[in-house]
Regions:
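Conserved AMP-binding/adenylate-forming
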Residues: 30, 47-103, 453
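Conserved AMP-binding A3 loop
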Residues: 33-35, 188-216
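AMP-binding/adenylate-forming catalytic core of the ANL superfamily
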Residues: 103, 120-122, 281, 288, ...
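Gly/Ser/Thr-rich phosphate-binding loop
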Residues: 168, 285-290, 301-364, 369-371, ...
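Conserved AMP-binding/adenylation subdomain of ANL enzymes
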Residues: 214-236, 244-287
Length: 554
């Protein structure tokens, strides 16, 4: 049997043929089978097609940074309709894209304009923000500023925007369901990434590549292989982080393309460890993804405080932010059946490297995934295990095409190295002596102090090991003497007292003294994004504004 490339709807159709009645999407109030979701997403696709959305130009007619398909903005918190919107758009050969609903209206408007959105599917409570973003009133054809609007009732009591169609109404008419186009592996998967990288960028993946490079598929997959995996099923996957970020989407699709049930956590409210653990217990979750210490710490505290049956949970994936060694150890002691998988990757690469920890054995280095490598500092060659040069993480093979509408960034981030198209997301790394890699972080997360380079994540890890420190971030700020100085922003545990000097000595006892912070700022709360990722913009601003709590470098 000849292997073939796959679009995501084609894979899901194979899974649905094998297990139509299996739960596919589950939330606190909704439970839908694979067959139900296939019907609903076909109806949504037909609705989008009737309103003119679809493919404009085929992939072979376009350059790497160009999109020839209609785009659909998804402005929602986690819910089954989020993934149904994505799959429905794929079936229409349109391209869904994530919008961070925490953005200000100006930022949302800029993103919709940048991507060229033709439709917006939104939670009703976010409707006023969407309307403000586009700044126009409804038109007779039911569009705002030319946008097709579909609203999802989130129970907020907020009225839909004028001219908007409710999600159930969009699905009510099955006209055109049997005339849908056949999605292509060349159809796009678009991830809009921002966070620590600044202005949002649209990362363009082919679906055939994202299926293998980010969603757990394989180059050798045939229909029989996919069907065989689907019959067994992948268990129950819990996507706890927000789907408005690529990592959670890929967790969800990795579960779905392997025939699993995906459980969604309502992220419209603050992180609730008790609700998370109750969900694991109720749904018998087998695999869950989290984002670093921001998720791990409250989970550990809640497991210690109350009794839960978490014996079904055998795998915990963590990425997007550092999970400290102490918290991993606590999770493994509390849940001895657990395997903790630290993942490293980016929107520009998919999963690149993994470290696996079990009870009694913690991984301290990453092992490279297929296609992942370390590039030399000058980006001219691939390093080999044994080289001690600090270079760049890189990936070849199943990687994105480029950045939407940005030729310059596309050619910078996806260069040719040794004749191979390569993704270089911007993280520094080196090989370890045993062939693993040590990821050192982005150049933007490096403080150059007195000619020495300090990778902030390394210092943050040590700070979080202190028993009195709840959370910490490290940044650089200008220094007349050293060019830059290391600044630690520290959140103490309730009731704890700690002097800046003792914080510095704690770091200096485990790392080179030049890596210890010259300034320590005690903060009531560390700034983090909704995903749990560090808010370094907040941290740098706080460091620049502070004029006290400086200790002398020795």
């Amino acid at each position: 049997v000849t292997a073939q490339e796959w679009s995501l709807p084609a894979v899901l159709d194979v899974v649905t043929d094998v297990a139509p009645d299996r739960d596919m999407l589950v939330s606190a109030t909704v439970r839908r089978s694979y067959a139900q979701v296939r019907d609903r997403t076909r109806r949504l696709a037909a609705y989008l097609r009737r309103h003119g959305l679809g493919v404009r130009r085929e992939r072979h007619e376009l350059r790497r940074w160009e999109c020839g398909q209609s785009t659909v903005a998804v402005v929602m918190s986690n819910c089954p309709e989020y993934l149904e919107t994505m799959i429905g758009a794929f079936r229409a050969r349109a391209v869904p894209f994530n919008v961070n609903h925490h953005y200000a209206p100006r930022e949302i408007g800029a993103l919709l304009s940048q991507v060229g959105a033709e439709a917006v599917v939104y939670h009703r409570r976010l409707g006023p923000k969407v309307a403000q973003a586009v700044r126009l009133n409804a038109r007779p054809d039911g569009r705002l500023n030319g946008l097709l609007l579909i609203d999802v009732d989130d129970g907020s009591g907020v009225a839909p925007l004028p001219g908007s169609t409710s999600f159930p109404s969009a699905l009510a008419d099955a006209q055109g369901v049997h005339d849908l186009p056949v999605p292509s592996p060349d159809d796009l998967y678009l991830v809009c990434t921002g966070g620590t990288t600044g202005t949002p960028k649209g990362v363009l993946w082919r679906q055939g590549d994202v299926y293998v490079g980010a969603a757990g598929g394989a180059d050798v997959d045939t229909r029989d292989v996919i069907a065989g995996i689907a019959r067994t099923g992948a268990g129950v996957w819990f996507a706890a982080p927000p789907l408005m970020h690529g990592a959670a989407q890929w967790t969800a699709f990795a579960g779905l393309v392997n025939g699993g049930t995906v459980v969604l956590h309502d992220d419209s409210r603050p992180f609730d460890a008790r609700a998370i653990l109750r969900t694991i217990q109720r749904e018998r979750v087998t695999m869950m993804s989290i984002v670093g210490d921001a998720y791990a710490r409250p989970l550990v505290d809640e497991i210690r405080a109350r009794s839960y049956d978490l014996t079904s949970l055998v795998r915990l994936g963590t990425g997007g932010a550092t999970t400290s060694a102490g918290l991993k150890q606590a999770l493994l002691e509390l849940l001895p059946q657990l395997t903790v998988v630290d993942g490293y990757g980016a929107s520009e690469t998919g999963g690149m490297a993994f470290g696996t920890s079990t009870s009694g054995r913690q991984a301290h280095r990453f092992r490279l995934a297929a296609g992942a490598a370390v590039l030399s500092a000058d980006r001219s060659r691939f390093l080999e295990p044994g080289d001690d040069e600090v270079g760049w993480t890189a990936r070849v093979g199943r990687i994105p095409l480029g950045y939407l509408c940005d030729r310059t960034r596309t050619e910078q981030t996806f260069p040719l190295v040794g004749g191979r198209r390569t993704s270089v997301p911007g993280d520094r790394a080196r090989y370890d002596s045993d062939g693993g890699i040590v990821v050192l972080g982005r150049d933007a997360m490096v403080v150059n102090t007195g000619g020495e380079k300090v990778f902030v994540e390394e210092v943050e890890e040590v700070l979080r090991q202190h028993p009195d420190i709840l959370d910490a971030l490290v940044v650089g700020r200008p220094s007349d003497r050293y060019g830059e100085e290391v600044v630690a922003l520290v959140q103490l545990r309730t009731g704890a007292q700690l002097s800046p000097t003792s914080v510095r000595e704690h770091v200096a006892g485990q790392l080179a003294r030049f890596k210890a912070p010259q300034a320590v700022l005690l903060c009531p709360r560390i700034g983090r994004h909704a995903t749990g990722k560090a808010d370094y913009t907040w941290a740098r601003r706080a460091a620049l504004e502070a004029v006290s709590a400086t200790v002398t470098r020795t």
